Swiss-Prot record:
Pathway: Protein modification; protein ubiquitination. The APC/C is composed of at least 13 subunits that stay tightly associated throughout the cell cycle: anapc1, anapc2, anapc3, anapc4, anapc5, anapc6, anapc7, anapc8, anapc10, anapc11, cdc20, cdc26 and cdh1. This is Anaphase-promoting complex subunit 2. Residues 214-226, 804-830 have a biased composition (Acidic residues). GO terms for molecular function: ubiquitin protein ligase binding.
Length: 907
C-alpha cells in the first residue's frame, strides 16, 4: 500500500515538473525575464524537494536536455536560417560580395545571434535553477551543464549538415573580416587625426628643428595613408561601418560577449587564424618588400599591439570587462577586487589564458612572416650592404626569436648558386659579395654557424678559380680596399699573446691550427678544453681529469673577414706564395726603388700571419735596397777608376745602367727565353760584373737577360717617341739602327737575320715583332722582311707621286674631274662611316672579351669568335678577320697580350 502511494506521488511530481518546464512558445522565450535566485517560489522549492526525495534528479535533467535538443533541431534551427533567406549562401564569397550586401549579411548575422542568445539565456536560467535546487550541495559543476547546452546549440543549429557548417563558417568569417577592416580604418583615422593635431601645433613654432620634425611627420602620415589604403579591399568607406567609433566598438564587444556565451568564439579559431595571419602577411609584404634601408620590425610589432591585439582583446576579453577596451594590457593587469564570484574569476582566467596563447601565436607569425619576407630578399640585402644594415638587424632579432636557421641556409645557398656562382660572374665580384655575406651573417648570427654552412659552396667555387688567390692578395695590398683597412686595423694583442712572435700557426699534436684574431687562448692547454659555441654564440667549458678550462680566459670566438678568405684554401701557404709572386712582379717593374708601400704591406702581413712565413719577402725587399746601394757604389767606383786612368771614353759607361741583384734562393723561379744582347750592352754588363766581383768577392753574377726594363727614345724622322720595354724588345729594335750612318728606315732585315742575331727561334722573333708592328715603328715590306716605318718620308713620297699624277691628268675635262672627286669622296665617307660603326660595335663587345679572358685565363682566336657568336649574336656580327684586327688593337692598347696562339689579360 505504501509502495503504491510513493509511486503515485512520484508520478504526480514528474507531471508537475513536465508541466512547469515544458518548452514554451517562441514569444514566451524571447520575452522571458530572468528572476533572481533568491526569489524562487516556495512551491517550486517544495516540488524540487520531492524530486530529490524520489531521486528523480537525473531523470528530470535528461528529460530537459532532450526537450531542448528537440526544440533546437525542429524550431530554433529554422528560425536562425530564416535570417539569411535573401542571401545566396551557395555563392557567398567575401572577395566578390559588394559592400552593401556584406553590410546586410552582417546585420542579419547580428540579429540571428541576438535570437540565439535570448534562447540560450532562457535555458541557462532554468538550468541554473536545477543546479541551485538539485545539485549544488552535491558539488555538481554548473559549467558542465552550460557546456552541454552550448554543444547542443552548436550541433543542432550549425552542424546539422556539412553544408550548413560551411555556410555558417563563411558568414562568421565575413563578419569578423569586415569588422577587422573597419577597425583598422578607424585606427588609421584616429592616428591621422593625431598627426594632424601635432602638425597644427608644429605650425605655431618657427624653429627650424621643429620644421624638420614636421616634415618627418608628414612623411610618416603619407606612409600611414598608404598602409590604410592597403586594407581597403572591399567597396566600403569609413562611413559605411558604424560612424561613431565608440558606438561601433561597444556594439561589436556586446556581440562578442554573446558569441562567448554561446561558445562560438572557441569554435572560430580557424577563422581567426585565416583572418589575422592573412592581415599580418599583407601588412608586412606591403610595407617591407624591397625596402632595406629602414627598420620595420619594431613598427610592425607596435602596429600589432595597437591593432591586432586590441581587436583580438575585444573578442576574447569582452566577457571579462564592461568597459571600453583602450588597452588590452589594462584588462590583463586589472584585478576586480569587488568581484567575489569564483566562477567569474575562473572564466576571466581562462579568457586571459586563451588571449595570451593567441598573442604568442600572432607574435610568432609576425616574426615568421617578416623573416620569410627578408630571407627571400636576403641576397639583394647582401648586395646592398651596408645600406641594408637596418633590415639585417631586424632579421637578426627574428633569428633569435624563432628557428629560421635551416630555411635561411637552404634559401641563401640556392640563390647564391643561381645568381653568383656561375661562369659569367667575375672572380672579384664573387669575392666582394662573399665579403658582404660575411658581414651580413655576422649581424644575423654572431656565432658564425650560419656563415660556416652558407660560405662552404662559395669557398669551394672560389677554390676552383685560378685567379682567386691573386684577387684576394690584390685586396690585401690595395689601400682603397676594405680588406686592406681591416688589415691596418688588426690588433695583434687579440691573438692571445702566443710566444711565437704573434705567429698564428700553432702546433698541437700532428695537426696545424689556425687561430683567429677573436680567439684568446692563454696557453695551448686552453685550446685543449675548448668546445664549439652554441647556436646563440655563448661559449662553455669542460673538465678533463684534474684540468679545468677557465671560462674567464675565453672570449667569444669570431672569425674576421681575412680569416674567412684564408680558409678558402685551408691555410696561408698558397696566399703567401702568390703574394711573393705578385711582389716579385712589382719589384721587377720598379724603376725608382720606391719601396715604402711594399715595406708597409709586408709589415702589416707580418702582424697578421707572423714573421716566419714572410721571411722570403723580406729578403726580396732587402735585395732591392742592397741593389740600389750597390749600383751607386759601383758607379762611383767606376767613375773614380776612369778618372785615375784618364779614360774619358768610359766615364759614362754605367751612368744609365741599373742592375737588380736577386738572391736566387728567396725569389720565385724566374723563367724566360735567353737571347744575345747587343755588344754595347754586353760591354756594360762585363764592366758591372767585374766591379761586383771585386766588391763582393767571391760572389759572381748570373745574368737573367730576359728580365728588366729599358727606357728608349726612338727618333724617326723629326718625331721622337718614348717607350719602356723589355730587354728583348729593345735589342730587337736596336738591330734596325744603321751602323754606317745611313738612314735607319732604308735598312731592311729579314726574319732569319733577326733570329740569328738574337740567337732565338723565328717564332719567338715574330712574337716580339708584334709589339713594334702594332705601334707602327716597323712595317713588313715583304714576306718576313721588315724596316723602320718612317711616316713622314712615306707621306712626302705620296705627295710627290700625287703631283706627278695630277700633271699627267691635266688633259682631262674639269667636269669629269669634279664627278670623279665626288665619287671618291662619297666612297671614302661611306667607308669611314662603316668603319666607325664597326669600331663602335666591337667596343661594345670588348667587355665580353675581357670577361671571358678573366674567367678562362687564355683563349685562342677561334674560341673567342665562337663564344661571341653563340652568346652575343645580336651584338656581334664581325668576321674572324675583323675580330683578329680588333684584338690586335687591344694588344696595342696593352689591355691584353698574345702568348703563342692564345690571348690573355695583360698583367
Amino acid at each position: 500500500m505504501f509502495q503504491n502511494k510513493e509511486q503515485t506521488e512520484s508520478i504526480l511530481v514528474w507531471e508537475k515538473i513536465v508541466s512547469i518546464f515544458s518548452i514554451p512558445s517562441q514569444n514566451e522565450i524571447l520575452n522571458f525575464k530572468q528572476k533572481s535566485p533568491n526569489n524562487i517560489d516556495n512551491n517550486l522549492k517544495q516540488l524540487f524537494n520531492f524530486v530529490k526525495l524520489y531521486k528523480l534528479e537525473s531523470l528530470v535533467l535528461d528529460w530537459y536536455f532532450e526537450s531542448i535538443k528537440k526544440y533546437f533541431k525542429s524550431t530554433l534551427s529554422n528560425e536562425f536560417w530564416k535570417f539569411f533567406n535573401n542571401v545566396n549562401l551557395a555563392e557567398l564569397d567575401s572577395s566578390t560580395t559588394s559592400g552593401r550586401q556584406l553590410k546586410f549579411i552582417n546585420h542579419q548575422f547580428a540579429l540571428s545571434i541576438n535570437l540565439l542568445h535570448k534562447v540560450f539565456s532562457f535555458f541557462k536560467s532554468n538550468l541554473f535553477l536545477f543546479y541551485e535546487l538539485l545539485f549544488k550541495k552535491e558539488s555538481y559543476n554548473f559549467n558542465f551543464l552550460i557546456k552541454k547546452l552550448q554543444d547542443l546549440l552548436i550541433t543542432n543549429i550549425m552542424h546539422t549538415t556539412n553544408q550548413q557548417t560551411k555556410y555558417f563558417n563563411t558568414i562568421l568569417f565575413m563578419f569578423f573580416e569586415r569588422d577587422f577592416i573597419s577597425f583598422t580604418k578607424s585606427f588609421y583615422h584616429s592616428k591621422k587625426q593625431i598627426l594632424k593635431d601635432e602638425e597644427e601645433n608644429n605650425n605655431n613654432s618657427k624653429d627650424l628643428e621643429f620644421n624638420d620634425q614636421q616634415q618627418e611627420e608628414e612623411e610618416e602620415e603619407e606612409e600611414n595613408e598608404e598602409e590604410s589604403k592597403s586594407y581597403i579591399i572591399m567597396e566600403m568607406s569609413f562611413e559605411d561601418s558604424i560612424t561613431d567609433i565608440n558606438i561601433k566598438e561597444d556594439s561589436f564587444m556586446d556581440l562578442c560577449k554573446k558569441l562567448q556565451d554561446l561558445n562560438f568564439i572557441v569554435i572560430s579559431e580557424e577563422i581567426f587564424t585565416q583572418i589575422l595571419f592573412k592581415k599580418v602577411f599583407e601588412y608586412i609584404e606591403t610595407r617591407c618588400k624591397g625596402v632595406f634601408e629602414k627598420s620595420f620590425l619594431k613598427s610592425i610589432l607596435e602596429w600589432a599591439d595597437q591593432v591586432i591585439f586590441k581587436w583580438l582583446a575585444m573578442i576574447l576579453l569582452s566577457s571579462t570587462t564592461t568597459t571600453k577596451i583602450n588597452n588590452y594590457n589594462d584588462i590583463i593587469n586589472n584585478n576586480d577586487d569587488d568581484n567575489d564570484d569564483d566562477d567569474d574569476d575562473e572564466n576571466k582566467e581562462n579568457s586571459l589564458k586563451i588571449f595570451n596563447q593567441w598573442k604568442k601565436r600572432l607574435e610568432f607569425s609576425i616574426y615568421e612572416n617578416y623573416s620569410q619576407q627578408r630571407i627571400s630578399e636576403l641576397f639583394d640585402m647582401i648586395v646592398q650592404y651596408p645600406d641594408s644594415l637596418p633590415s639585417l638587424e631586424d632579421l637578426s632579432i627574428c633569428f633569435q626569436k624563432i628557428p629560421i636557421e635551416k630555411t635561411m641556409i637552404t634559401n641563401l645557398k640556392r640563390v647564391l648558386h643561381n645568381r653568383l656562382l656561375h661562369p659569367g660572374a667575375n672572380t672579384s665580384d664573387i669575392i666582394t659579395q662573399y665579403i658582404s655575406t660575411i658581414h651580413a651573417m655576422d649581424i644575423i648570427d654572431p656565432s658564425g654557424m650560419v656563415m660556416e654552412k652558407v660560405g662552404k659552396p662559395i669557398r669551394e667555387y672560389l677554390s676552383q678559380r685560378e685567379d682567386t688567390i691573386r684577387c684576394i692578395i690584390s685586396s690585401f695590398t690595395e689601400e682603397s680596399n676594405e680588406i686592406y683597412q681591416e688589415l691596418c686595423n688588426y690588433d695583434p694583442q687579440d691573438n692571445g699573446g702566443d710566444d711565437d712572435s704573434n705567429n698564428s700557426l700553432l702546433a698541437f699534436g700532428n695537426c696545424d691550427l689556425y687561430v683567429d684574431e677573436g680567439d684568446n687562448f692563454s696557453s695551448i692547454d686552453d685550446f685543449k678544453f675548448w668546445i664549439p659555441n652554441k647556436i646563440d654564440g655563448s661559449s662553455t667549458t669542460i673538465s678533463i681529469g684534474n684540468a679545468k678550462a677557465n671560462n674567464n680566459n675565453k672570449k667569444k670566438k669570431k672569425k674576421d673577414t681575412i680569416s674567412h678568405l684564408v680558409n678558402i684554401y685551408d691555410g696561408i701557404d698558397l696566399f703567401i706564395n702568390e703574394y711573393r709572386s705578385m711582389l716579385s712582379d712589382r719589384l721587377l717593374s720598379v724603376v725608382d726603388f720606391d719601396l715604402d708601400k711594399e715595406i708597409k704591406n709586408i709589415e702589416l702581413l707580418k702582424l697578421r700571419f707572423g714573421d716566419s712565413v714572410l721571411f722570403n719577402c723580406e729578403i726580396m725587399i732587402k735585395d732591392m735596397v742592397d741593389s740600389k746601394r750597390l749600383n751607386l757604389q759601383i758607379k762611383n767606383s767606376q767613375g773614380v777608376n776612369n778618372n785615375n786612368n784618364n779614360n774619358n771614353n768610359n766615364n759614362n759607361e754605367l751612368k744609365e745602367f741599373e742592375t737588380l741583384i736577386l738572391s736566387q734562393l728567396f725569389w720565385p723561379t724566374l723563367k724566360g727565353d735567353e737571347f744575345k744582347y747587343p755588344k754595347s750592352i754586353e760591354k756594360k754588363m762585363q764592366i758591372y760584373s767585374k766591379e761586383y766581383e771585386r766588391i763582393k768577392t767571391p760572389r759572381q753574377l748570373i745574368w737573367k737577360q730576359h728580365l728588366g726594363l729599358v727606357d728608349l727614345d726612338l727618333e724617326i724622322g723629326n718625331n721622337i717617341q718614348s717607350f719602356q720595354v723589355s730587354p728583348i724588345h729593345a735589342t730587337l729594335i736596336m738591330l734596325f739602327e744603321s751602323d754606317d750612318g745611313d738612314d735607319d728606315d732604308e735598312k731592311e732585315l729579314t726574319l732569319e737575320y733577326l733570329s740569328k742575331q738574337l740567337e732565338i727561334s723565328k717564332d719567338l722573333v715574330k712574337k716580339k715583332l708584334i709589339f713594334w708592328l702594332n705601334n707602327q715603328i716597323i712595317k713588313e715590306t715583304s714576306h718576313e722582311t721588315y724596316k723602320i716605318n718612317n711616316k713622314e718620308k712615306e707621306e712626302q713620297k705620296q705627295r710627290q707621286q700625287q703631283i706627278e699624277n695630277d700633271d699627267q691628268d691635266e688633259s682631262s675635262s674639269d667636269d669629269d674631274d669634279d664627278d670623279n672627286n665626288i665619287v671618291v669622296e662619297e666612297e671614302e665617307e661611306e667607308k669611314s662611316t662603316s668603319a666607325k660603326e664597326k669600331e663602335e660595335q666591337m667596343r661594345v663587345v670588348e667587355s665580353f672579351i675581357i670577361g671571358m679572358l678573366i674567367n678562362f685565363k687564355t683563349l685562342p682566336l677561334e674560341r673567342i669568335h665562337s663564344m661571341l657568336t653563340m652568346f652575343n649574336s645580336e651584338l656581334y656580327t664581325s668576321t674572324i678577320h675583323e675580330l683578329k684586327a680588333f684584338l690586335s688593337k687591344l694588344v696595342n692598347e696593352e689591355k691584353i697580350e698574345l702568348v703563342g696562339n692564345d690571348f690573355k689579360i695583360k698583367k
